[in-house]
């Protein structure tokens, strides 16, 4: 009977050996084969297929009960309050992240959603090793981010939409050269990578322009190049399209989609622009007030509201529907400035409600739409708030 091979993982590499014959050992990437979790593969499966099978099942990012509590000084107002604070200070604790757990496989492009202050950026910083968690643990490609090992630093990149890593008074190309030296990237590899990224983002004519003289969209493209020069396997993006015009947003989204498809980079994206999420992510993780409230397919989240449609009706002048009609058709809203009348109704009644609208009075225009993702997310936050209220 053929014995199966047993594979171990450390730093996202696979090491295989025959269980019944210790003289047979294959070290695919070169490291200690005794470290890491065990993974079993069929005995005659070629090693390169074993490697692919292994990576398709082992998470790239594992987060278990990750919590971060910030302790802040509570200042008492007034002069004597300041004096008292010199001797006896009062502090309050605020949990930015509470027992967050999730796993992300290699190559996944996951949206990380939540309102301002929900804990998204805090979580990304913990995964990057910039801040320590109060409790819980995380593993990224087998590494513990809190140890800040150099090998791990070469594995990931963090892009913060509102913070720059490029030197303001230098051309972008000089910042790239400095990053090449920091990461120890060979010159030939650096040139190949840079040429590819510059071509994909169409910024070849801007490399020698001072960063301070670039537009916001051009600066963000340069930030992405800087983050990807060392070919990271994991990319954390914190609102990369914030403040960009529509054309720049589209260019950045197109680049990220193509880069993820081509190199299977694992990407965790936060954004308040739902167009980013809809175009790039098949899965979303939603957090609110530090708690995870949804983790699953974006389609499933939308399907939760898919049983409803939104009817937009434009009424001429001061025309209005009878009060008895508006009160009997669920959620209705009238905008007196635009004359727009909005009705949300179940999909199965959409035809009947539309016909009733048209027969009720003069209508300038009528449109039937799906409920926007922004509204679905907002309703998710609202329902979570309602559940958390004491009875």
List the predicted regions and their residue ranges:
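Conserved ABC ATPase "signature" region
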Residues: 78-86, 177, 181, 188-206
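Conserved ABC ATPase signature
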Residues: 169, 210-214
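Catalytic Walker B motif of ABC-type/P-loop ATPase nucleotide-binding domains
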Residues: 235-239
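Conserved catalytic motifs of ABC-family nucleotide-binding domains
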Residues: 231
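Conserved ABC transporter NBD signature motif
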Residues: 136-146, 151-156
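ABC transporter nucleotide-binding domain
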Residues: 253-344
């Amino acid at each position: 009977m053929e014995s199966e091979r047993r594979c171990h993982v450390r730093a996202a590499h696979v090491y295989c050996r025959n269980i019944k014959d210790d003289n047979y050992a294959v070290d695919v990437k070169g490291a200690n084969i005794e470290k890491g979790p065990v993974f079993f593969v069929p005995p005659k499966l070629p090693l390169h297929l074993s490697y692919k099978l292994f990576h398709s099942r082992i998470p790239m990012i594992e987060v278990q009960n990750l919590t971060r509590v910030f302790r802040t000084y509570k200042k008492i107002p007034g002069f004597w309050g300041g004096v008292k604070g010199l001797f006896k200070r009062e502090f309050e604790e605020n949990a930015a992240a509470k027992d967050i757990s999730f796993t992300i496989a290699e190559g996944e492009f996951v949206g990380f959603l939540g309102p301002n202050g929900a804990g998204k950026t805090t979580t990304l910083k913990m995964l990057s090793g910039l801040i320590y968690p109060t409790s819980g643990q995380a593993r990224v490609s087998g590494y513990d981010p809190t140890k800040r090992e150099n090998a791990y630093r070469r594995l990931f990149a963090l892009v913060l939409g509102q913070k720059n890593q490029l030197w303001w008074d230098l051309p972008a190309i000089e910042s790239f050269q400095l990053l090449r030296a920091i990461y120890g990237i060979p010159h030939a590899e650096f040139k190949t990578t840079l040429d590819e990224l510059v071509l994909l983002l169409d910024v070849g004519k801007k490399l020698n322009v001072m960063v301070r003289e670039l537009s916001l969209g051009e600066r963000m493209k340069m930030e992405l190049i800087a983050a990807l020069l060392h070919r990271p396997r994991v990319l954390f993006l914190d609102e990369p399209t914030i403040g960009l015009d529509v054309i720049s947003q589209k260019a950045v989204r197109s680049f990220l989609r193509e880069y993820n498809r081509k190199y299977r980079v694992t990407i965790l994206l936060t954004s308040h622009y739902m167009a980013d999420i809809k175009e790039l992510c098949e899965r979303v993780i939603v957090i609110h007030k530090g708690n995870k409230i949804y983790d699953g397919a974006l389609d499933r989240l939308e399907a939760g509201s898919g049983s409803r449609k939104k009817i937009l009706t434009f009424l001429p002048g001061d025309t209005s529907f009878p009060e008895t009609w508006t009160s009997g058709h669920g959620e209705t809203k009238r905008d007196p400035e635009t004359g727009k009348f909005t009705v949300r109704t179940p999909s199965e009644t959409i035809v009947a409600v539309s016909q009733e609208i048209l027969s009720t009075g003069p209508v300038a225009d009528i449109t039937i739409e799906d409920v926007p993702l922004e509204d679905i997310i907002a309703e998710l936050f609202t329902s979570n708030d309602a559940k958390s209220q004491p009875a």
